[in-house]
Amino acid sequence: MIDKRDDKPFKLKSKYKPSGDQPQAIESLVDNIEGGEKAQILLGATGTGKTYTMSQVISKVNKPTLVIAHNKTLAGQLYGEFKEFFPDNAVEYFVSYYDYYQPEAYVPSSDTYIEKDSSVNDEIDKLRHSATSSLLERNDVIVVASVSCIYGLGSPKEYADSAVSLRPGQEISRDTLLNQLVDIQFERNDIDFQRGCFRVRGDVVEVFPASRDEHAFRVEFFGDEIDRICEIESLTGKTIGEVDHLVLFPATHFVTNDEHMEQSIAKIQAELAEQLQLFESEGKLLEAQRLRQRTEYDIEMLREMGYTSGVENYSRHMDGRSPGEPPYTLLDFFPEDFLIMIDESHMTMGQIKGMYNGDQARKQMLVDYGFRLPSALDNRPLRREEFESHVHQIVYVSATPGEYEMSQTNTIIEQIIRPTGLLDPEIDVRSSMGQMDDLLGEINQRVARDERTFITTLTKKMAEDLTDYLKEMGVKVKYMHSDIKTLERTEIIRDLRLGVFDVLIGINLLREGIDVPEVSLVAILDADKEGFLRNERGLIQTIGRAARNVDGHVIMYADKMTDSMQRAIDETARRREIQIAYNKAHGIVPQTIKKDIRGLISISKTSHNDISKEEMDYESMSRGERKEAINALQKQMQEAAELLDFELAAQMRDLILELKLMD
């Protein structure tokens, strides 16, 4: 039985106190949650401290909370911030554990079967296990997740029921414990002691939980009774202290007992017979042979090992679900009365909606051509309506809430005031006639003041032509296009901040990590061309890029005023008016945000000094040199992950993949 520690409240630690309109936003959100309001929107302008407000709300309502972001980088940033705010509570990180993932697929036009290929990040796998075990053991839990949280995970009941509970004085033989550990997918390894392993030394069993990376546990027996349980350092074996209760959760999230396994195998065999009969009646003999061979091999592995590669494709049978029934996900590990917060909801909710369709199209092809049983279709992400069925209470957080969020609630809490006193930028609308000369004059003014400029265009050709023109005019300019890899992108932003160049041109400059305080001018070309990047939401996001500088200014070049432009201008003016009034009433003088400039990632070669990426010619490196570079990067990636700098770790991961693809 798992003893759930449910009496520990969230304790927020911060040197800041709520300011601006944060107190009003916090109070409104908390009152609405405690009053039973199901959905509400926190409409927070860029730079107003939305994460701090979210933390205050969590500490006051005291509910287990799931925070969902739309990519790993943002999830990592939020995780780091919440860890600082709640050092005494369980702040967990749950994203896809693949550094690299090529899903299983079949392309009938070329008769090409692509086998699943992946590289699992051990650190993230540990954090995923830490998240699920924390949810089952305690209530003071915040899980920061990507949309991976809506993918199938295995039954929380099986996961909890399979847990091994140990106490000093408990009557259990050493061999019984060893068998129980094997049943929950722990491996015996007396040499290489790592996560998900155990080792045996006489009457002493040492176990390394899947959710830990530095600490393991030593269980000492006296006959058929546990004499003592100690927490130890996994590397040195040094005792940290005694524990009075140890719960060991399975080493994999897909786990089942022997009885359920045989029932599951019987269902798999029945489905196989049915599908083989269908293929043979349609004359699809190759597909039938392919399916029989693969499925029978998987069944043999399940019987002998309790696990097989791709076991998740049989999850419907393992979980005892009906066809079409949604899979268990991370959301099922939470208690019923939990809180969901959706960060950047205008992006994240769109992702949640789109995950299901893409997954089904790929898997249907595998089923049609005999690579998988039809039940594989039920190993899938949740549909949006299935996600909604898990929602007890939800807060959508965005500077520009989407239509979906607005349709879910009329309760909108605004957070417009920035603690720094910074205002939303002033906006000019100018004719596109003579825009190049006008823009050049504006850029030169910024260069003279050591400030930077963003220019956003709608087409690649326009961006390239503008880059060439500005270079001819003597402007230090760069164009950031979609082919640029993550690490190069980070270097470009860094060089812009350092003044290596003064102007950055791009098509979509809304992506994360583009907040540059040195930017005082944002120029929007073709502002009157309605579409994804020129709708009201896209324009407000782009305008926000100039809201980090006290001299922030936006110029829209257009031949007519569109409805989207007018709404974006009106909304910005409304916010600016509120901000000016607040600053005047409280004697606040706006100041440009001060933000440290992170150094470049460098790769240490054995016989050379540290060499940054831009100084290295990877293509001219020998295979051996590239291997050394990869090994050095992997070490630095692990160090970054241990320091909870997942943004840096993700950049290193991307560079490692680039290097591997060169071999």
Curated annotation (Swiss-Prot):
Region Disordered, residue ranges: 1-23
One Gene Ontology term, aspect cellular component: cytoplasm
One BP term from GO: SOS response
SMART domains (UniProt xref): DEXDc, HELICc
Location of the protein in the cell: Cytoplasm
Domain UVR: 627-662
Domain (Helicase C-terminal) ranges: 435-601
Superkingdom of this protein's organism: Bacteria
Binding site for ATP: G44, A45, T46, G47, T48, G49, K50, T51
Domain statement: The beta-hairpin motif is involved in DNA binding.
Family under the similarity heading: Belongs to the UvrB family.
Protein name as it appears in the record: UvrABC system protein B
Natural source organism: Streptococcus pyogenes serotype M49 (strain NZ131)
